Amino acid sequence: MVQQRSITFVDGYSKPAITTTELDLDNCFKDDEIVIKVKCCAINPIDMVVYGLSTTWLTGCKPKTFGRDFSGVIVRAGSRVDPQWKVDDEVNGQYVHLLGDRGSFSDYLIFNPAKNKSIAHMQKFPRGEGALNYNEGKYDDWVLNASFPLVYGTADSVLADYIKKWTPESRILVIGASTQVSNCLIQIAKRHYNIGTVVGICNKNSFEYNEKFGWDHLVSYNDGKTIENVTKLMEEKLGGEKFDMIFDSVGNTDFFPVIDKFLKPKSTGSYFLTVVGDNKLDYKNPTFRRAMPLSVAWKKINPFLGFNYSTVLVKPIDRYMKLSTEMIQKNQFEPVIDSVYEFDQYQEAMDKLLTNKAKGKIVIRVNK
């Protein structure tokens, strides 16, 4: 028997807490499941949204465990598990779930890797001369590998699931260049797909921070003239050419009334994609109205909408974990870390996320 600590919640009105149970490592898993001793996990906005929206009448009174992203070591493997996943393998990935007693904010994570395929063998990030070195060597591979699966997988879906073919002539406009999904997107877009032009909209104070990741152009929203600023850029730098895709990672409606001026015709296969809907979510006080607005649902089913529109949801597939492995090995990708907290500092980690001021991912070290 071992101790299983988990960071849990009952509903959005209760405070997160560490709950402790006894776990029988030899009998806690099915023959198609693996048991991972978690080294690090990362906190994501979805964790706080699910927590904030939970009510006992809807989600029950049992403790639910936070967390999706993880890095760790396989300590048990069932007899029917694919032999590529063996005891002592160092792995990372995303445990895709909504609610339940299993989550990555735990000492041990149990799941079926044939169903939850977003898992990979952990990679060693290049160090020293020639490496991307966005984190200046501050963090170990457990931290780095735990930080990115969800945001990387989301960025991969944006680029792989909607546009049939990317070329050096392709153009993307990203609303919210400073988010971590957008940070992954720019690295994948420029270094894997070789997309010709990627433009990001962000705070002008973040230009210097963002430039090193590969943005071709950055546009400020500070003066309240985002539409005018993007129009000027298109006229002066892009030959008046429109975008193949507009990706919204923050929640914005500015472009909808004038979408035809910026997005190529629907018939070309262009897309407007979002991960948050039309409005920025308040992670401290999320509401169903903002998390699942009717306007988003209507855009998705409206046959008369003049442009292709979709929300992006990351799935438990292995494609993006394989791509991340390839890009790390080629020194083409490195996630950015804002801060690392110890397990009992989970509330500080959550509070930092809720400030919306983190410059990179927030990671919790579960076991050393």
Curated annotation (Swiss-Prot):
Entry's Gene Ontology molecular function annotations: alcohol dehydrogenase [NAD(P)+] activity
This protein's GO CC annotations: lipid droplet; mitochondrion
Keywords assigned by UniProt, alphabetized: Lipid droplet, Mitochondrion
First-listed, main subcellular location of the protein, grouped into a coarse class: other
Subcellular location field: Lipid droplet; Mitochondrion
Stored Pfam families: ADH_N (PF08240), ADH_zinc_N_2 (PF13602)
GO aspect biological process, one term: DNA damage response
Record CDD domains: AST1_like
Entry's family note: Belongs to the YIM1 family.
Protein name: Protein YIM1
Lineage: Eukaryota, Fungi, Dikarya, Ascomycota, Saccharomycotina
